[in-house]
């Protein structure tokens, strides 16, 4: 009960603040995070972003806090201007400089090499493990960089750099992924039935705050996925099944992290008449995934499974950079067998309780589905044998989308049994 009271009081206090004051606090926290990251990170791309972003965050935080003490007639316009300033200072400038310096997270090189292979008609799933050793390992690089832990469609972000030995300028995969993220998220925000105030908050968390800006400037592979998921959510809210199927299908054809929402959407999708259209959504998603994936599965099924499933789950016998000190990884380090068993057991137990919850609250609303997926993501991230703290952006965004839709009290899709 005490925890519930504290949560409710904190929520009431936050809601009592003006939108600009809330922005100022978020940007101030972002400035602190950027400064700490600059001091503590050992990865050049990350600490450079931290030092570059702390100034814009701090400046905009001060402006927002000062203006938040006044009653402004065009508060949303001021918030939007400050948002643009932050995106320029914490995303575009660091991204441009780091592209010029050629400092990036390892996944950027992995995606660019896959694009080069794809442009030559070759399979991006070159490396695989057999009898405890890596086959076709790329010389001169860590073993984990030989793996391509994505679905084939992710290779398209590496195609612009395919004609050059080294990606430069606009051909850098991060630039392409950032453009894709901005286009998809902009379309989604325009489509969403939310107030301008809520849309700005969604854009802040997705793009402007470190939950988006850090990843866009240094790695970026999860950002197009999140933008497409947001577009899928907007389409579900507006009951546009075809658009929902295309956006969720594209996301699912890039990375496994899109699958929970792509599957969950089947429970809440409906048309303007209120009838369930889950079959049409299923056709779109499965068709896109099948067309882009099956040729590679047929060509080398073992290599595909080794890259897309075994490696991300820590079962490929290769040291992965996805080694954040979360419970699942710690347990796997101490007791490997128990660590690898924990995730599937948690998945089964969690699936049981989720099904009970869904049955009790049937029919599910879109807001409630997003909340369930947010909790599920957070739990699985903690118990997975190979994971990274950066995946927290998935449950954070899903929780925010659920919250703003619930508070907005929009008419949400529910499953209508026919």
Language model regions located:
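A juxtamembrane structural motif centered on a specific transmembrane helix
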Residues: 403-418
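Nucleotide-activated chemistry modules centered on ATP-dependent adenylation/adenylyltransferase
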Residues: 84-86, 416-417
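Transmembrane helices and adjacent periplasmic/lumenal helix-loop junctions
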Residues: 242, 246-270, 291, 385-391
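Juxtamembrane helix-loop transition sites at the ends of transmembrane segments
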Residues: 243, 276, 321, 411-414
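Composition- and surface-driven signal marking solvent-exposed, interaction-prone regions
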Residues: 245-248, 393-396, 410-413
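Primarily membrane-embedded glycan-assembly and transfer machineries that use lipid-linked glycans
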Residues: 1-83, 90-233, 269-392, 396, ...
């Amino acid at each position: 009960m005490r925890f519930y009271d504290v949560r409710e009081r904190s929520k009431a206090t936050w809601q009592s603040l003006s939108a600009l004051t809330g922005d100022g606090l978020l940007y101030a926290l972002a400035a602190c995070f950027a400064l700490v990251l600059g001091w503590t990170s050992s990865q050049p791309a990350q600490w450079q972003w931290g030092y570059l972003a702390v100034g814009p965050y701090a400046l905009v935080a001060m402006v927002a806090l000062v203006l938040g003490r006044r009653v402004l007639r065009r508060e949303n316009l001021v918030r939007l201007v400050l948002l643009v300033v932050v995106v320029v200072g914490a995303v575009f400038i660091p991204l441009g400089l780091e592209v010029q310096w050629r400092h990036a997270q390892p996944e950027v090189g992995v995606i660019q090499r896959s694009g080069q292979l794809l442009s030559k008609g070759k399979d991006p799933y070159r490396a695989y493990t057999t009898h405890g050793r890596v086959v076709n390992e790329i010389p001169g690089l860590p073993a984990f960089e030989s793996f391509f832990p994505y679905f084939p469609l992710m290779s398209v972000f590496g195609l612009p750099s395919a004609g050059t030995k080294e990606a430069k300028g606009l051909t850098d995969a991060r630039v392409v992924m950032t453009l894709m993220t901005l286009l998809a998220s902009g379309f989604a925000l325009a489509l969403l039935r939310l107030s301008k105030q809520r849309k700005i908050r969604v854009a802040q968390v997705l793009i402007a705050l470190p939950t988006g800006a850090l990843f866009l400037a240094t790695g970026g592979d999860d950002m197009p996925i999140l933008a497409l998921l947001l577009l899928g959510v907007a389409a579900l809210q507006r009951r546009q099944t075809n658009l929902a199927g295309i956006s969720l299908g594209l996301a699912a054809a890039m990375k496994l992290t899109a699958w929970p929402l792509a599957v969950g959407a089947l429970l809440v999708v409906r048309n303007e008449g209120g009838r369930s259209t889950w079959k049409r959504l299923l056709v779109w998603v499965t068709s896109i995934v099948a067309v882009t994936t099956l040729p590679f599965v047929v060509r080398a099924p073992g290599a595909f499974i080794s890259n897309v499933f075994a490696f991300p789950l820590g079962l490929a016998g290769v040291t992965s950079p996805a080694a954040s000190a979360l419970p699942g990884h710690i347990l796997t380090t101490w007791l490997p067998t128990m660590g690898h068993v924990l995730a599937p057991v948690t998945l089964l137990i969690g699936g049981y309780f989720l099904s009970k919850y869904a049955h009790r609250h049937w029919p599910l609303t879109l807001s409630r589905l997003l909340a369930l997926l947010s909790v599920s993501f957070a739990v699985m991230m903690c118990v997975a044998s190979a994971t990274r703290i950066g995946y927290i952006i998935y449950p954070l965004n899903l929780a925010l989308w659920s919250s703003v839709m619930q508070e907005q009290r929009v008419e949400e899709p529910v499953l209508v049994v026919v």
